[in-house]
């Protein structure tokens, strides 16, 4: 099974849009090998082709069955990639690929829904703690060389309302809950493991 990995070089207005983002989101041969080593029954059947942008896209996709990518040339994909069975988008969202009328018949497309939950939980926890502790006002006062006492009690015992407790909001709720804050949620169904 040939897997074509299409990485993107960073560019303004694109993804990734910084050199740091390119380093985070690039799937190197080592990263690919590390990811598949936990699945020896499958990994022995895989060959990978690591590519950049569309440098070798058409020639490599002639015999690729799997495409691992953020974006791709959608025009004439059935002709360019006649053996393609599966496209996996490395992001959680696929809105940039809409409308999906370009997907050849018989090709499955999947995404990384939930992959950003851990980082979103950390970012959300940081944001909640900063707001609770008046850090934006403290930073503004410091910049203005003003000293005002701004106090905050511990967050334990406070209530946080999370609007949307999918994978991202749920991760924030769990992180804040671990500090003793209660969570309210605004979703139509209860997510297991989140106390309301």
Name each region found by the language model.
Residues 5-7, 69, 91, 164, ...:
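Short beta-strand/turn micro-motifs composed of small residues
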Residues 45-53, 66-71, 140-148, 192-196:
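Short gly/ser/thr-rich secondary-structure transition/capping motifs
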Residues 150-196:
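Rossmann-like dinucleotide/phosphate-binding beta-alpha-beta segment
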Residues 1-66:
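N-terminal glycine-/charge-rich "phosphate-binding" loop or analogous flexible N-terminal tail
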Residues 32, 53-54, 71-75, 92-95, ...:
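Short, polar loop motifs at secondary-structure junctions
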Residues 63-139, 153:
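Phosphate/diphosphate ligand-binding glycine-rich loop within oxidoreductases
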Residues 115-119, 146, 159, 167:
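Residue-level detector of alpha-helix initiation sites
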Residues 45-47, 108, 182:
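Conserved beta-strand segments of alpha/beta enzyme cores
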């Amino acid at each position: 099974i040939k897997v074509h990995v299409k990485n993107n070089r960073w560019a303004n207005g694109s993804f990734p849009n910084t050199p740091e983002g390119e380093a985070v989101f690039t799937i190197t041969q080592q990263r690919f090998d590390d990811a598949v080593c936990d699945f020896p029954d499958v990994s022995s059947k895989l060959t990978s082709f690591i590519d950049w942008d569309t440098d070798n896209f058409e020639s490599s996709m002639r015999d690729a069955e799997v495409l691992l990518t953020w974006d791709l040339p959608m025009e004439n994909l059935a002709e360019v990639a006649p053996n393609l069975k599966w496209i996996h988008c490395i992001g959680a969202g696929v809105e940039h690929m809409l409308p999906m009328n370009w997907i050849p018949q018989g090709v499955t497309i999947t995404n990384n829904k939930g992959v950003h939950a851990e980082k979103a939980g950390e970012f959300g926890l940081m944001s909640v703690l900063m707001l609770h502790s008046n850090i934006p006002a403290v930073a503004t006062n410091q910049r203005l060389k003003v000293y005002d006492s701004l106090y905050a009690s511990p967050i334990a015992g406070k209530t946080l309302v999370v609007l949307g407790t999918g994978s991202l909001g749920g991760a924030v709720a769990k992180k804040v809950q671990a500090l003793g804050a209660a969570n309210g949620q605004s979703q139509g169904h209860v997510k297991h493991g989140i106390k309301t």
